[in-house]
Amino acid sequence: EHFRPGHVRHQVVVGPKFLYALFNPQDQLHPVSRAFMTFVRDGDLPYRRLIVNDHIVDEAATRLKKQASMRNAASFLTTLDESTVYQFEPISEDVFDAAKATFVEWTDLDASFTDFVVAAHMDELEVDHVLTYDRHYDAFDVTTLPYRNQD
């Protein structure tokens, strides 16, 4: 029982900070994001479905436009449209309501509303891995990737 292999996850949620770094060559984490995606593309990692939702796309596209360039934002949006790996999953009203309730209740967590939406959406989709550089996700019951040293 203890040595039974775990369920292989073929899907992962892609957070806005990971996407920002991936589509902004000037970002210090761009090489890490690119390397991670190369592993995904080459089949070295089990992920075949990269999930994004409305809030993730909004935050990543807006940040790319304002802090990088419109060209980077457009490249991101075009990639989402043309890629067979990225899967857009709109959030339900139940996810929004759950995120809203948790956002209001968890007053000690300095996370964005998007973070709460993503966590609630992951719970609904039964996805427990998220690609992110956002440490706020450590407060939720999810596994963050790429792995990093815990300070």
Description of each model-found segment:
Residues 89-128:
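Active-site neighborhoods of divalent-metal-dependent phosphate/nucleic-acid chemistry enzymes
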Residues 19, 57, 137-138:
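A generic structural signal for short hydrophobic patches within well-formed alpha-helices
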Residues 1-6, 119, 125-151:
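Acidic, PIN/NYN-like endoribonuclease modules and their adjacent C-terminal/linker elements
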Residues 1-52, 65-75:
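Short, well-structured N-terminal submotif of metal-dependent ribonuclease cores
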Residues 62-89:
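Helix-adjacent hinge/juxtasegments
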Residues 87-91, 145-147:
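Short acidic-hydrophobic, aromatic-tinged amphipathic segments that line or gate anion-handling sites
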Residues 46-49, 85-87, 126-128:
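Short active-site oxyanion
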